[in-house]
């Protein structure tokens, strides 16, 4: 029997199958890409409203450089409580309502507690380990604990004598030399913070550590300015040598970093050595933490403590200075408020003694004046930006991961629907209610896990200065050569911390008895 011819391989079937499979795969891939693009487009369409965005650059050319909170407030009247900006691909979400801020930054704080990465202030100038700049994590939580356990409501009473002594020295200094107003405010607030934090006594305006502290604060303010530094827009520049043309900012950052790290180590080491030998004032934050460690403080704990202490110093300095200057400016523009506040002090405290922080609960109008100072010219009008760690949805709007979240504190505290005549300084708007005042401080001192850990300590400093000034002096305008009173304009800087500019006045003692009481109260605390 003849063998049958071999059957040729059936090449056509597998080829057809492979072609069909490739076609299905290609169609599936295209469909997936289409779905992805449609989803991305849908997300983009569902983002919060905002100003028109140009292709590629978005809103980069529209971003305000001067007093951005005012521009954002105007946009809020058009786009609502939350709006979206795109600056060269960087997502920015601006929150203009306390209700929205509470929902996102408080209730959803697990994903809204990050910080945007800023190359200039962090990588280059070296402020990245301070609480205000750190991403949310273990070290930040540890630093906040170290501050909170020393400056809590149960412990701050031990520092009242320091705050009161500095307030009285401040007033005497301005009485003697009105031109020293800003210098006296800076020196005495620094004295309070450095004594409480490090046990270090500031010896005067020429004190080396005081001078370095002010310089560190000023450098932080410069380095953190948004939209100013090329390195923040092109982070790769941090790897370039500072001698290259056009990169002089890198050289400045090197100097800022050196000053920061050198001073941080020096003042911490001073505290450690002098707390042990009894030279430093006790208690102080650093010494208290080290004492609790009972000689077993790790290097990691000491580094966290060193940066936590520096945060209290630099973070407390500029915001407290801002608030006191705002208060003084308000008293110059609203003398009737000043008279009413003085009348309350006279009725409650009398003229036989100087007011104390312990009088605070009996002085609701003074508390209202302070709350109104926080509201009228908030120290941080855009707070400090948060960063969103995950995609999120709010009220049907898509908020993308990596967004910079900017709480527009200025608008929240100047919304005419909540605060009628928002540009007017009116302590009466609170009706003496601490609940209403707390609504202001809850906004002015930050949100969620990023709220100021030194709030109660700062309150004592501000109250002590405000009540001491009002009890003993009239805040009056300076007089020019023609006998005309010069009331300073309401002008302020464009920085992370708003600070009134060119505030000049005279502290005129209300009586010789008041001035004598100030002089007699000077003790060895400072």
From Swiss-Prot:
InterPro entries (alphabetical): Cyt_P450, Cyt_P450_CS, Cyt_P450_E_grp-I, Cyt_P450_sf, Cytochrome_P450_fung
Glycosylation sites: 219, 277, 320
One Pfam family matching this protein: p450
Ligand binding (heme): 452
This protein's UniProt keywords: Glycoprotein, Heme, Iron, Membrane, Metal-binding, Monooxygenase, Oxidoreductase, Transmembrane, Transmembrane helix
A molecular function (GO) term: heme binding
Localization per record: Membrane
Segments traversing the membrane: 15-35
Enzyme Commission number(s): 1.-.-.-
Descriptive protein name: Cytochrome P450 monooxygenase 226
Organism: Postia placenta (strain ATCC 44394 / Madison 698-R)
Species lineage: Eukaryota, Fungi, Dikarya, Basidiomycota, Agaricomycotina
């Amino acid at each position: 029997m003849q063998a049958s011819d071999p059957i040729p391989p059936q090449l056509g079937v597998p080829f057809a199958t492979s072609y069909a499979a490739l076609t299905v795969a290609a169609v599936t891939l295209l469909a997936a890409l289409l779905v992805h693009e449609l989803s991305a487009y849908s997300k983009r369409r569902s983002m919060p409203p905002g100003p028109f965005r140009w292709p590629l650059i978005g809103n980069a050319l529209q971003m305000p450089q001067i007093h951005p909170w005012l521009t954002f407030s105007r946009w809020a009247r058009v786009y609502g409580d939350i709006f979206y900006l795109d600056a060269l691909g960087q997502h920015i979400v601006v929150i203009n309502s306390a209700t929205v801020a509470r929902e996102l930054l408080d209730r959803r704080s697990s994903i809204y507690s990050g910080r945007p990465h800023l190359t200039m202030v962090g990588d280059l100038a070296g402020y990245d380990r301070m609480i205000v700049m750190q991403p949310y994590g273990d070290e930040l939580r540890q630093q906040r604990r170290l501050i909170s356990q020393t400056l809590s409501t149960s412990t701050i009473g031990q520092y009242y004598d320091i705050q009161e002594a500095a307030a009285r020295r401040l007033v005497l200094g301005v009485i003697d030399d009105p031109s020293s107003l800003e210098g006296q405010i800076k020196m005495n607030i620094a004295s309070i913070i450095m004594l409480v934090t490090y046990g270090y006594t500031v010896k005067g305006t020429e004190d080396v550590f005081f001078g370095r502290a002010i310089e560190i604060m000023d450098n932080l303010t410069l380095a953190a300015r948004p939209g100013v530094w090329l390195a923040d827009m092109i982070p790769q520049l941090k790897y370039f040598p500072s001698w290259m043309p056009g990169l002089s900012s890198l050289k400045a950052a090197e100097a800022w970093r050196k000053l920061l790290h050198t001073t941080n180590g020096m003042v911490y080491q001073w505290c450690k050595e002098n707390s042990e030998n009894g030279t430093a004032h006790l208690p102080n934050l650093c010494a208290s933490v080290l004492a609790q460690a009972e000689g077993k403080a790790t290097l990691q704990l000491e580094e966290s403590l060193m940066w936590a202490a520096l945060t209290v110093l630099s973070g407390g300095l500029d915001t407290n200075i801002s608030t006191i200057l705002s208060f003084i400016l308000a008293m110059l523009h609203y003398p009737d408020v000043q008279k009413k506040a003085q009348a309350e002090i006279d009725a409650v405290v009398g003229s036989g003694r100087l007011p104390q922080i312990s009088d605070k609960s009996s002085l609701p109008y003074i508390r209202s004046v302070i709350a109104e100072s926080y509201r009228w010219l908030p120290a941080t009008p855009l707070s400090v930006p948060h960063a969103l760690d995950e995609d999120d949805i709010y009220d049907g709007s898509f908020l993308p991961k990596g967004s910079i979240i900017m709480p527009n504190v200025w608008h929240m505290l100047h919304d005419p629907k909540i605060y009628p005549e928002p540009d007017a300084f009116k302590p009466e708007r609170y009706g003496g209610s601490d609940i209403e005042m707390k609504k202001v401080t809850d906004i002015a001192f930050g949100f969620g896990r990023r709220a100021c850990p030194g709030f109660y300590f700062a309150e004592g400093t501000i109250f002590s200065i405000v009540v001491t000034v009002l009890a003993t002096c009239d805040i009056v305008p300076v007089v020019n050569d023609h006998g005309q009173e010069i009331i300073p304009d309401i002008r302020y800087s464009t920085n992370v911390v708003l600070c009134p500019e060119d505030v000049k006045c005279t502290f005129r003692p209300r009586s010789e008895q008041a001035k004598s009481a100030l002089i007699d109260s000077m003790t060895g605390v400072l």
